[in-house]
Amino acid sequence: MLRPSGRAANQLRDISITRHYTRHAEGSVLVCFGDTKVICTATVEEGVPRFLKGEGQGWVTAEYGMLPRSTGSRMGREAARGKQGGRTVEIQRLIGRSLRAAVDLTLLGEHSITIDCDVIQADGGTRTASITGACVALVDALRFMQRSKMIQTDPLRHLVASVSVGMYQGEAVLDLDYPEDSNADTDMNMVMTEQGGLIEIQGTAEQAPFSEDEFIQMFTLAKEGISELCEFQRQSLTD
């Protein structure tokens, strides 16, 4: 089976993580999974949501959006429609859950970190790229908090990354781009820690049910791919 991109079944797209991409945010990253490009910023603010006031712990949340021409044809801005779409809400909740799993919220004090993920070009895997890049932006925000004496102890538990896998033309493949994603029999997104701990699995049989053996094949590919992505994260954080 030849993938449209010519990649091997277990091969990630070209990955790059560029830190300090914008000027103002406490953490900012441009993350590229092939032709999918996302700007991720992390903003540190005093205070927490109402349900956490007085609890002595912090909060991490996320917002997600796509530029109108991040895709082949222009999409209307959700702000112009006056409401977010269901897909947007689902993805930003996933990003928030994934990043909260990366930190010990009790060590943040009553501070909030808001992650903004803005897709500037989409070619499949925007949510997985967002999570992977946002984790690096989050680490930079935590480092800022330590330098500024806002917190005393590093709250980072582990790096978190995400990748897509799927069944394409009867074979398990890693890191689907748009041509594969739109024609896959199964599409799955996995979020894991750098130690291989599972945070979330989202999987859907698009064309036909998938077997337990196929699931194991996809899981194995995802675990290996996320291990590679975490190495990209570590390398970027030492630059």
UniProtKB/Swiss-Prot annotation:
UniProt key word tRNA-binding: yes
Disulfide linkage: none
Keyword Endoplasmic reticulum: no
Protein function: Phosphorolytic 3'-5' exoribonuclease that plays an important role in tRNA 3'-end maturation. Removes nucleotide residues following the 3'-CCA terminus of tRNAs; can also add nucleotides to the ends of RNA molecules by using nucleoside diphosphates as substrates, but this may not be physiologically important. Probably plays a role in initiation of 16S rRNA degradation (leading to ribosome degradation) during starvation.
Taxonomy of the source species: Bacteria, Pseudomonadati, Pseudomonadota, Gammaproteobacteria, Cellvibrionales
Catalytic activity: tRNA(n+1) + phosphate = tRNA(n) + a ribonucleoside 5'-diphosphate
InterPro entries given in the database record: ExoRNase_PH_dom1, ExoRNase_PH_dom2, ExoRNase_PH_dom2_sf, PNPase/RNase_PH_dom_sf, Ribosomal_Su5_D2-typ_SF, RNase_PH, RNase_PH_bac-type, RNase_PH_CS
Quaternary structure (record): Homohexameric ring arranged as a trimer of dimers.
Pfam families: RNase_PH (PF01138), RNase_PH_C (PF03725)
Family to which the UniProt record says this protein belongs: Belongs to the RNase PH family.
GO molecular function: 3'-5'-RNA exonuclease activity; tRNA binding; tRNA nucleotidyltransferase activity
Coiled-coil residues: none
Binding site for phosphate: 87, 125-127
Source taxon at top rank: Bacteria
Name of the encoding gene: rph
Keyword terms, alphabetized: Nucleotidyltransferase, RNA-binding, rRNA processing, Transferase, tRNA processing, tRNA-binding
Name assigned to this protein: Ribonuclease PH
This enzyme's EC code(s): 2.7.7.56
